[in-house]
Amino acid sequence: CTTVLFEGKPVGTPDAGAFWKIISEYNVKSLFTAPTAFRAIKKEDPDGKFFSKYDLSKFEALFLAGERADPDTIKWAETLLKVPVIDHWWQTETSWAISSNCTGIEMMKTKYGSACKAVPGYDVKIIKPDQSLAKPNEMGDIVVKLPLPPGTFPTLWNADKRYEENYMTNYKGYYQTYDAGHIDDDGYIWIMSRTDDIINVAGHRLSTGAIEEVLSEHQSVAECAVIGIKDQLKGQLPIGLIALKAGVTKDNETITKECVQMV
């Protein structure tokens, strides 16, 4: 097995076909990258004109991780590449995927916005602020029942105490991922945000990732981010920031109104 490392941007080096050139030249079978890279390509080349210049007949799968993969980007990549686009979730601490659609076992149905189900070796749970286990579709902190499977981090370098305090103390018997989300009725895991990205609006715990998912569905939006700001009445309010696709001519005021209405 050979790994090709590409150090550089997926656009502007010299164009939005940088990934396709590497895949074609080296007969790459699988690509692992962050959703941001594909959002950047989609913004610069929404119709895939650069993609059509290269032979990607050996390419078999795209794996997206490192941040939340919005459904619109996944669907765009599927349409363009005609191969499985797999949104999976793992952490530096775990060294390998916690949840994924495993191509080597049996491909499961894709649920856009979900990182699929826990892979063998992981028992993933959702815990609410009151320390109780969440019901299906209830938002909470994502944890993994101990012991962790082989290959995950056994401690922190010269910091055994900090390892225990940071990861194993807040939820007894569980590894705390510091990610937030929910598990649906079918066992699919939905990673919505980091725990510090949950905002409280008038007593309602809202996921910035869930709001970003809605904004990204607007046909003119290439990238978006949602943050919480202080509000005297409601505690916090969500503020959305959007970057438009290349070539959009619709005025900003109209797009803003449409985005607010969608949310």
Each model region followed by its residue ranges:
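Gly/Ser/Thr-rich phosphate-binding loop
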Residues: 1, 28-33, 42-110, 123, ...
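Short, P/G- and charge-enriched loop/turn segments at secondary-structure junctions
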Residues: 107-114, 166-168
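Acidic-histidine catalytic/liganding microenvironments
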Residues: 44, 160, 217-219
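Conserved beta-loop-beta connector loops within the AMP-binding
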Residues: 125-146, 185-186, 248-256
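Active-site glycine-centered loops adjacent to acidic/histidine catalytic or metal-binding residues
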Residues: 66, 90, 116, 179, ...
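Conserved ATP/PPi-binding loop(s) of AMP-dependent carboxylate-activating enzymes
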Residues: 117-121, 132-167, 206
